[in-house]
Amino acid sequence: MISRTTRRFREALAGLPQDVRRQARSAYRLFRDNPRHPSLQFKRVHPSLPIYSARISGDYRAVGSFSGDTVVWFFVGSHADYDRLLRAL
C-alpha cells in the first residue's frame, strides 16, 4: 500500500507536540508494514466516500482518502478535531 500526504497534513503534523510526531512516525511505520495491525484501528469512517482513519494514539488520529492501493493522508490532529472533521464530511 502506498501512502502520500498533503501539504495541509504535513503542516498540521509539524505543529503537533514532538511526542505526538514521534507516535505518528511509529504509526506510519506500522501502517507501512501491516495496514491491518489492530493498534492502528484502520477503518472506513464515511458511508459513501472512501475516507479512512488510523489511530496514532489515544488522543490523535490521521484521516486519508483511499484510492486503489494509495492512501492520501489529508488530516492529522486531536480526537476532538477528528470528530469535528467527520461531522463536516
Q: What do the PLM-derived regions correspond to, one by one?
A:
Residues M1-A27:
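Arg/Lys-rich, positively charged N-terminal/basic patches that mediate binding to nucleic acids
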Residues I2-R4, I56-L89:
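Enriched for short, Lys/Arg-rich terminal
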Residues S3, R25, R36-S39, V76:
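Non-catalytic, surface-exposed connector residues within folded enzymatic/regulatory domains
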Residues R10, Y28, F42, W73-F75:
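Tryptophan-centered motif/residue detector
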Residues R29-A54:
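A short, surface-exposed loop/turn module that caps and links secondary-structure elements
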